Structure formats: C-alpha cells, structure tokens
C-alpha cells in the first residue's frame, strides 16, 4: 500500500474504487482494440462520409433512449446488472459486425443501434457507480487515473490491433481482435461481482430533475455545457480516424496514431490529476478548450499524416486539461443539487441526454452541410463550426458558484451516514 501511495499521492482509496477502476480499464482496452477500426472497416466497404455519419447518428440516438430505460431499471434492480447488460450488448455489436462481414455497410442503422444500446447501459451504470463510490476528495484522482488507464489502453490497443489486422489476410485479423475484446468484456463482468450491491429505491423523477434547471442555475449551466461538449464530439469521433486511414491507407499507421496520441495523453492525465487544484479548475477548462479548438487548424487547410500526428499530440494535452476538472465539477454540481441522494440516477441520465443531444445536432448539421456543399468544402466548414463546442464549455461553467452555509456542505450516503463535502467549486473523441 505504501508503494501505491507513492504513485497516486496522498489519496485514500477503497476496494470499491479500485474494482471500478479495473472494470473501466478492461472496458477501455476492449474498446481500444476494436472500436478504433470499426469506422475504417465500414469506410472500406462504403467509401462515403454520409454513411459513416448515419451509422454514428444511430449510435448517439439510441444512447439517450437507453439511458432513460436503464435509469428506470436502476431504480428497481442493482446497478451492477445494468453494467452487465451494457457489456453483453457491446459483445453483440462486435459479433454482429463480424457476422455481417462484407455486408456490414448495408446494415449501418441496426449495427449502430446495438452499439448505442451497449454504450447506454454501460455508461449509465458506470457513471452512477462513480458518483456513489467516489467522494469530492477522490474524484479528481479517480478521473485522472481513469484517464491514465484509458490512455494506456489507447497505446496498447490500436497498435496491437493495427499490427494484427495488417499482418493477417482477409478479415482474419478483425476476427482475432474482436474475439480478444469479447474476452476482456467477459472479464469485466466477472470483476463486477466484487462490487458492493448499491440498490436505489423510489420512483423515477426525471421531470423533477429537468425542472431543477429553472431553480438551480449551476445545474442549468452544467447541462448547457454538456450540450456544447457533444456538439464537437458528434463528428470528430469518427472523422479523425478515417482521415488517418485515407492519408496512409494503412491500419498500422492508424495504430501508430493511436499510440502517439495515447502516450502523450497518458502523461497529461497523470499530471492533470496531480497538479490541477480545485481553485484552478475553470482556468484549466478554458485552456483545454482553446487548445482543442486551436489544434483543429493544424489539419483544416493542409492534411497529411504528419499534421494529423501533430494534431493528435495537441488534443492529447487539451483533453486532460479540460476533462479532469470538468468531470469533477459536474459531479460536484450533482452532489449539491436538490434530492441528489434520491435522484442521482436521474441527474446522470439528464446529463447524458444533453450530451447526446449535442452529438445528434452535430451529426445532423454535418449531414446537411455535406449534402448542400461538396465534401471538400463541407467537411472543413463543419469542423470549423462544430469544433467550437469545447471552448464554449467555459462560458457556461465560469459562473458556477457554491454557497458556504452551515449544513450545505453535507450530503447523505445511501446508508444514512453523512459524507462531508468540501466547499469547493465542485466531475469524456470516444
């Protein structure tokens, strides 16, 4: 334990937090191995950006619907079961892509819907468990360390998958990689049995939580911020990987891009989680947002593998600066909101609805612009307009404030014991 302290710093961790980090790490590796190449796999069959946009639109449309259904279920059954449902649907997605083979591009809506359902179930459960297991003093550590695990997976997964796919003939490499991802998902399910049961009672109060936007300005600001976060993520999540493949025509080059991006991100997340203090959260969010938008201009007018790699380095620095304080800020806003203990699931669901609403609007705008203009004009224009989403996050979070009155810095745990929260300012391309 003393050696662990030297690595993570002066942070008190419990078994539940460590198990949740392990599950998140397994998920990240499974996704990093396979998901990086799905858009390229479909691109090689279709060759149309509009088709990729429709596929991703199906994903982000099903996610909020599934979040709503998962939220209602989580009021009746253990959240860990919801987590397992998500992993099962993710496994079904990779199996469906594998079984569809060369006809996958003709089933874009169905395949995307399955993945959207998997994401919805998994992330609802993971986010709720994160809120319940972490505390204000450990949230920055958890978010930062989760970023380190994701970055580690991002380094290992794409380069390994790219090497295997490029070395094996036909679709054999995809079969191997998808099978390995399924094994990691299965292990994540096994690890979930070590999590303490955390039942939630009561009725689903989504309408009341939505109504809180009228009386709780912090909640209104943070949900608006999530809409604009989704505005960028909607199209960037699938365009960049395809750009790399188009420039290089190599899955191994795409894996190299992922390796470089994640290697930088690994260190950036580590230092962000250790160095960004609560009073500096908003400045960090602004700096991260500006870096992410500024990096876009590296590839907007001239695109090559070298400029894409440079872009990858800059966003690997920008995302930790933005997300580590931003995600912690979000969870602290929820933790101090009315009925936070009873309605934590509803708060998570509504947050995701705003995030995915931004993604849906992003992809719809992209489809409209590309349909009206040629791709060589429409795509750069879409990137320039929709990429502004991350800098705009700061506009909404800059005025978030917390009162410091007696009794307001306490929230109640499920077991009825008080969890003291500090009077702070107050918790992410997929």
Swiss-Prot record:
Q: Name one GO molecular function term.
A: transmembrane transporter activity
Kindly give the Pfam families that the UniProt entry links to this protein. MFS_1 (PF07690)
Keyword Transmembrane helix attached: yes
List the InterPro entries hit by this protein, alphabetically: MFS, MFS_trans_sf, Sugar_transport-like
Protein's organism: Bacillus subtilis (strain 168)
| N-terminal signal peptide | none
Q: What is this protein called?
A: Uncharacterized protein YqgE
Question: Where is the protein localized?
Answer: Cell membrane
């Amino acid at each position: 334990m003393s050696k662990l302290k030297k690595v993570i710093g002066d942070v008190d961790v419990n078994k539940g937090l460590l198990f949740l980090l392990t599950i998140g790490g397994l998920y990240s590796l499974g996704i990093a191995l396979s998901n990086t190449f799905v858009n390229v796999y479909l691109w090689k069959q279709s060759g149309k950006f509009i088709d990729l946009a429709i596929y991703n639109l199906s994903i982000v449309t099903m996610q909020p619907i599934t979040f709503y259904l998962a939220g209602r279920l989580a009021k009746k059954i253990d959240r860990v079961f919801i987590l397992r449902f998500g992993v099962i649907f993710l496994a079904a997605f990779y199996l469906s892509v594998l079984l569809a083979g060369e006809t996958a591009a003709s089933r874009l809506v169905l395949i995307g819907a399955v993945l959207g359902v998997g994401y919805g179930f998994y992330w609802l459960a993971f986010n709720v468990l994160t809120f319940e297991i972490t505390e204000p003093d450990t949230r920055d550590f958890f978010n930062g360390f989760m970023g380190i695990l994701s970055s580690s997976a991002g380094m290992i997964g794409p380069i390994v998958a790219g090497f295997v796919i490029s070395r094996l003939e036909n679709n054999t490499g995809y079969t191997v990689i998808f099978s390995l991802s399924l094994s990691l998902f299965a292990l994540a399910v096994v690890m979930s049995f070590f999590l303490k049961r955390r039942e939630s009672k009561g009725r689903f109060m989504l309408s009341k939580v939505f109504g809180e936007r009228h009386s709780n300005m912090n909640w209104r600001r943070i949900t608006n911020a999530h809409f604009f976060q989704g505005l960028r993520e909607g199209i960037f999540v699938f365009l960049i990987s395809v750009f790399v493949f188009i420039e290089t025509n190599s899955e191994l080059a795409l894996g190299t891009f992922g390796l470089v991006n994640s290697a930088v991100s690994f260190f950036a997340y580590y230092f962000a989680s250790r160095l960004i203090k609560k009073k500096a959260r908003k400045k960090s969010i602004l700096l991260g947002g500006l870096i992410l938008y500024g990096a876009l201009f590296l590839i907007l007018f001239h695109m090559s593998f070298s400029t894409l790699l440079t872009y990858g380095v800059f966003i690997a620095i920008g995302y930790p600066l933005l997300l580590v304080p931003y995600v912690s800020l979000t969870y602290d806003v929820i933790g101090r909101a009315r009925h936070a203990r009873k309605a934590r699931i509803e708060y998570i669901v509504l947050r995701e609805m705003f995030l995915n609403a931004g993604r849906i609007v992003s992809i719809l705008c992209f489809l409209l612009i590309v349909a009206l203009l040629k791709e060589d004009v429409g795509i750069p224009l879409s990137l320039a307009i929709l990429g502004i989403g991350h800098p705009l996050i700061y506009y909404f979070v800059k005025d978030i404030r917390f009162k410091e009155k007696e009794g307001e810095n306490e929230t109640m745990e499920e077991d009825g014991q008080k969890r003291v929260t500090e009077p702070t300012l107050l918790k992410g391309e997929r």
